[in-house]
Each structure stands twice: as C-alpha cells, then as structure tokens.
Amino acid sequence: MDRSPTSRRRRSLLKGAGAAAALGVAGFPAIIRAQSDAIRIGHLTPRTGFLGPLGEYAVMGVNLAVDEINAAGGIMGRKLDLIAEDSVNPQTASTKAERLIERDKVVAIIGEISSASGLAIAQVAQRNRTLFFNTGCNSDELRGKSCNRYMFHTEAANSMYVSACGQALLRDGMVKGKKWYSLTADYAFGHDLLKVAKRFMTANGGEFAADELVATDVADFSPYMLKIRNAKPDLVVSNLAGAQITNF
C-alpha cells in the first residue's frame, strides 16, 4: 500500500544507511582478514527506469553511511570501498552482481528496491557464497521460499505493511463489508503485495471490486480513473511503485 513522499524519502535514506551500518556489526572477520587494505562492498540499486527516483535516495543514504563509517575510522581500522552500479532490471542486476563478486572481489552486496532484481541478486549471492543485504525489496517470497543463508533483510515485508495498515482500516470500519479497488504494479513486488492484500481482505470480511495490473511504463492513468469512478469502491488501494505513484 502506498506511503507518503516524505515517508518514502526517509525510508530510502535509512535503507542505505542501515545497510552499510549492518556491515559494521556483521563482523565476518575471516572474510575481512582475507582482503587487502580496504573492505570492498557493492551497492546495486535502480537509478534509471520507473524506480530510478527511489534509487537516487538509496544512493544518497548509502553514501552518507559509508562516509560516516570511514570518517570514524572504518571497520576494525579499515575503510570501506564502495562500488555502486545501476541495476536497472533483473537481468542487469544479475550480471552486475556476478561482476562485482568475480571481478571486483566484493565481500558483500547491499541494496535493491525491485523485488524481482533482489531475487536475481540473491541467487547470484547464494551461488557464490557472498552476503547480500536486502535494503528495499518488500516481497514476502524473498523471506520465504526464495530466502537463503546468505541473504539478510533490513526492510519489512509486504505482509507486515498490509497487517499494520489493515489494522488501522479495520479500526475505522473500512474493511468488513467494504469493496476495495486496487491498482497494482505489474512485476514481482506488486504481484506479491496484491496476494497478501487479498488474503487480508478475505480473512476480514471484505472484497475487491476489481484489481488492475498496471505496466511499469504507464504514465497516463486516465483510463484507470474512469474505471474506478464507475466501480464506486469504498477505498482505492495503490500497490504501485516508483514513478507510477507520482503519475497516479
């Protein structure tokens, strides 16, 4: 479900800062001792495409965290060397994750916003036995059947957000006997979020009047607005992402 622009900006900054800070407490001394002077880590996040605006905030956050850690003397006396890449899409994310590990010899990868790209990176990390800190992917699948021992999460799952928002809506009488109309981003994150939201509605006596999958490159929401007006739902639910939210 959608969150305010201020909240999204704050979360994006915290995601990057939290991820780099996590490296400071994670330890893995055996890996650190095997490296040269600096501790090299990779950061993958979309900086172009419909998630690009969110990615820019993630970049600001991780740069801030790395600068603060290095200014304080680094980790165990060693500075962090950050290598950042634009992940763009799942295929590119997978390719760049492989390159960061094999060519750049990073000890860990942090980042992502796209759940589909996060899954691709997680598979590469598992195959290469490299740590992956997920700082922005919300899909429950990444914490369930697709989770692995090399992946750690600093961001909440879709089910957590649905439960929190849902309890507030239950309190205000906006669930039982009500009809919702959802617009959902047509990729892994959106599909997962819609599934969780439907499960919540079914369990609490509500229903969806309709649910529309929206392509990630859609800029004109006029046709959807007309459908919503005709459906007369009690609540419109935005399961959109990135530039979709602004355009809607």
Regions from the PLM with identified roles:
Residues 1-9, 16-26:
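N-terminal secretory signal peptides
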Residues 28-47, 51-54:
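C-terminal segment of N-terminal export signals and the immediately downstream linker at the start
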Residues 50-60, 188-192:
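Glycine- and acidic-residue-enriched helix-capping/strand-helix junction motifs
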Residues 140-141, 149-248:
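Extracellular/periplasmic Venus flytrap/periplasmic-binding protein
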